Design a protein with these regions (language model features):
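Structured catalytic-domain cores with a bias toward divalent-metal coordination
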Residues: 1-343
């Protein structure tokens, strides 16, 4: 049976590229680049998005290396593949082109906060609707590849939800750990890709490697290796290493320490004031509840905010730019580690 996403149509044992057209405004179409790989043997469907945020580059780089490589398109590879892969290479093309932080410049909205979207909404809502209905629907597992944004550093982590269905939740943990990140963060986030994928019947997995607008080969390779790890866990077979993985060499997977809670901290300063953010911690730092995490200062050094840790936790991401506005994220903590012990 053929597998199709947009104009990409792949017969069994073939790979196809094409475009998913979304009418993001009357008379305006956004063209999302897509890849479809249809294995020669029946099996599960893996759906993947990358580039939900325009300045997060490791995910798109990983998919381009992994799915567009000569080995990925080799007839022997495709004939042995069980199931299919459908993927977007730049889910928010306008944000990618603009090097935009957090939001889609077409409407100023965060594409990962408007799911499941609307066919008649704003540009981001229409893209979300297209992804939900045409890519997520029918998938067994959904991966959303991210990095820290242009202004963020992070410690590699995976995010999954727990539903209360013991068998399904155990499966989500196994798939999440197959990615090979340092942390496995448990939590639900309404309006996001992975939450919507869960509602549509797929196990949704958020994968975060790299950040700060960089395209570090190690983190690109770890994203690619994570996709292959999930494919192996799904029983799709041994997909060939990407060129970037071969270039980087052997990778050491993270421990995937489970974190059962999280806390985000945001700037709380006057809306008309430009803040100057001076963090006192780094990504991967383990902090105690009540510990000072930094200061947001005014231009002349007056202290506007002294955020402290609301929980014992590890810094999973951190805004690294000096400029800070009211309501902007400062950092996030993951807490309640598995077994109560930090690695």
């Amino acid at each position: 049976m053929n597998v199709q996403l947009g104009t990409a149509i792949a017969a069994p044992g073939t790979r196809a590229t094409g475009w998913l057209a979304v009418e993001t405004a009357p008379g305006e179409q956004t063209q999302i680049p897509v890849v479809v790989i249809n294995g020669g043997q029946p099996g599960p469907r893996l759906a993947i998005t990358a580039g939900i945020h325009g300045g997060e580059y490791t995910g798109p780089a990983a998919l381009r290396s992994l799915l567009l490589s000569a080995k990925a398109g080799d007839p022997a590879t495709l004939s042995n593949l069980k199931g299919s892969i459908i993927a977007t290479l730049a889910t928010s093309p306008a944000a990618f082109k603009a090097r935009s932080i957090y939001v889609n410049p077409q409407d100023g909205k965060n594409l990962n906060r408007v799911y499941p979207g609307s066919a008649t909404g704003s540009a981001s809502e229409r893209i979300a609707h297209a992804i939900a209905t045409q890519l997520m629907t029918g998938a067994d597992v959904y991966l959303d590849l991210h990095a820290g944004d242009i202004n963020e550093a992070l410690s590699p982590f995976v995010g999954i939800e727990q539903t209360g269905d013991a068998a399904r939740d155990a499966r989500a943990v196994a798939l999440g750990r197959a990615v090979g990140a340092e942390w496995l963060l448990i939590g639900a986030s309404p309006g996001t890709t992975t939450s919507t994928a869960e509602q549509l019947g797929a196990i949704g997995i958020l994968c975060e490697f790299g950040g700060q607008g960089h395209v570090e080969p190690e983190f690109v390779a770890r994203h690619a290796a994570g996709v292959r790890g999930v494919m192996a866990e799904m029983g799709m077979g041994n997909f060939p290493q990407s060129p970037i993985e071969r270039e980087v060499g052997p990778l050491k997977p993270g421990a995937s320490t489970r974190l059962n809670s999280e806390a985000w901290l945001r700037a709380e300063i006057p809306a008309d004031v430009a803040g100057y953010w001076h963090p006192a911690v780094g990504v991967g730092s383990v902090v105690k509840k009540g510990e000072k995490l930094g200061e947001v200062q005014g231009v002349f050094g007056d202290v506007l905010q002294t955020p402290t840790a609301p929980i014992d936790g590890v810094v999973i991401f951190l805004v690294t730019t000096l400029a800070m506005n009211n309501g902007d994220p400062l950092l996030a903590l993951g807490g309640d580690p598995e077994g109560g012990v930090w690695p």
